[in-house]
């Protein structure tokens, strides 16, 4: 898209602030992983493996987490809700990750729950082997795949995985956010 998506505005706040506000309803700690983070009220962690793509960012999030589990959300998924994460949290017993499946049947590893210890160990090993895909991590640990049919009845479920990759996507997100407010 040519710009830092985390700082795009939706409802007069950055995507990062918007997502953090949602997460603060279910946790008291939100950490942003990356460079040039301007949201001063949030804890910031740097990538351990800079420029290693999504798996590197995921590793940075897991490495920075001080709890048993981490909720990981990409900065370009501004329509996630508390209800989605509450449902995912109910599914974690006996698993290392809980990952929703999008309507197009693809997993969404950047909107998921991760048990820190096993996932960090596997993410480190995968990176050291030259791997870059979060899906490699999900296949290496005990993953609970949550089908879209299990979450489709949640409020706003059709919007959860609308990520912002183009200026047109951003324009549509602004319109959708305005429509959801009314």
Sequence positions of predicted segments:
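Nucleotide and nucleotide-moiety/phosphate-recognizing core
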Residues: 1-131, 136-160, 171-181
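Active-site rim beta-loop-alpha module in soluble metabolic enzymes
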Residues: 165
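Adenine-nucleotide cofactor-binding loop residues
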Residues: 168
């Amino acid at each position: 898209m040519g710009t830092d998506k985390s700082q795009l505005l939706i409802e007069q706040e950055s995507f990062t602030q918007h997502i953090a506000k949602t997460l603060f309803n279910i946790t008291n700690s939100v950490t942003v992983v990356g460079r040039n983070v301007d949201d001063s009220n949030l804890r910031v962690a740097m990538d351990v493996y800079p420029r290693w793509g999504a798996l590197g960012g995921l590793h940075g999030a897991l490495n920075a987490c001080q709890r048993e589990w981490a909720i990981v959300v990409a900065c370009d998924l501004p329509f996630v809700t508390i209800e989605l994460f509450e449902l995912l949290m109910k599914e974690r017993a006996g698993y290392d990750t809980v990952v929703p499946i999008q309507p197009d049947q693809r997993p969404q590893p950047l909107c998921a729950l991760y048990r820190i210890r096993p996932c960090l160990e596997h993410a480190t090993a995968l990176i050291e082997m030259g791997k870059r895909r979060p899906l490699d991590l999900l296949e290496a640990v005990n993953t609970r795949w949550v089908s879209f049919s299990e979450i489709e009845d949640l409020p706003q479920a059709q919007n959860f995985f609308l990520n912002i990759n183009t200026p047109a996507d951003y324009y549509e997100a602004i319109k959708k956010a305005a429509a959801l407010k009314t």
